[in-house]
């Protein structure tokens, strides 16, 4: 059963998951499917790496074949399990062995598990898609987790759409938690997005790929360099 027994006090949280504001946003490279891309992202300066465990994703990672190389990544880099409406059994499998530092969940059917997930001690990120420029996408006051990710919307997709939204909307969402900006970010536009949204972190998948699931290392390097170059 999923409960506080899954908690591991011995695992130190990477900086990405501490909630401390820096002079520039943290960077998360998402949808990583192989060790070469993970290592390159870290060498270029990524603070976190996301692994998509949703079978319906173009970036789906078969976890059983990836545990060894994921666990070998530097401990100061946040390893984030990304899921879409996962079952309790799936979440328990992901949390086994402290392979991941945090959970990032898309969809809504997992909401009833939020309090139990927080009790495990794993930081929880709720990912939502911005569909309407005139209102908050859903009521966020109830959410007990670590952070909220705002992503672009495309019907039928749960993330990694490459779609942007009005970045300045993030400044209106006062929820007392770190806000992560995602959706359509690229090396060419991430500085402008940061200046408008002032997020805690930026998240990118499509914008640094040569094809779904395969990262373009030059784009990753340029994206991270662009974020690092944002003036305080």
Predicted regions and their residues:
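Conserved N-terminal beta1-alpha1 strand-loop-helix module at the mouth
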Residues: 2-232
């Amino acid at each position: 059963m999923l409960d506080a027994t899954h908690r591991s006090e011995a695992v130190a949280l990477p900086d990405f998951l501490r909630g401390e504001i820096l002079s520039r946003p943290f960077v998360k490279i998402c949808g990583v499917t192989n060790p070469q891309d993970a290592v390159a992202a870290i060498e270029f300066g990524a603070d976190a790496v996301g692994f998509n465990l949703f079978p319906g994703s173009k970036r789906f990672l078969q976890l059983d074949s990836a545990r060894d190389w994921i666990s070998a990544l530097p401990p100061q880099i946040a390893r984030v399990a990304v899921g879409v409406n996962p079952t309790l059994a799936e979440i328990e499998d992901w949390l086994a062995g402290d392979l991941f530092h945090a959970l990032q969940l898309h969809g809504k059917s997992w909401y009833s598990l939020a309090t139990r997930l927080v009790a495990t001690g794993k930081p929880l990120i709720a990912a939502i898609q911005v569909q309407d420029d005139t209102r908050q996408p859903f009521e966020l006051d109830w959410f007990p987790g670590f952070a909220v990710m705002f992503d672009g919307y495309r019907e039928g997709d749960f993330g990694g759409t490459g779609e942007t939204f009005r970045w300045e909307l993030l400044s209106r969402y006062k929820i007392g938690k770190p806000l992560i900006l995602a959706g359509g970010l690229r090396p060419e536009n991430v500085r402008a997005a940061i200046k408008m949204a002032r997020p805690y972190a930026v998240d990118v998948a499509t914008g640094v790929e040569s094809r779904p699931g395969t990262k373009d290392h030059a784009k990753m390097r340029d994206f991270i360099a662009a974020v690092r170059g944002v003036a305080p």
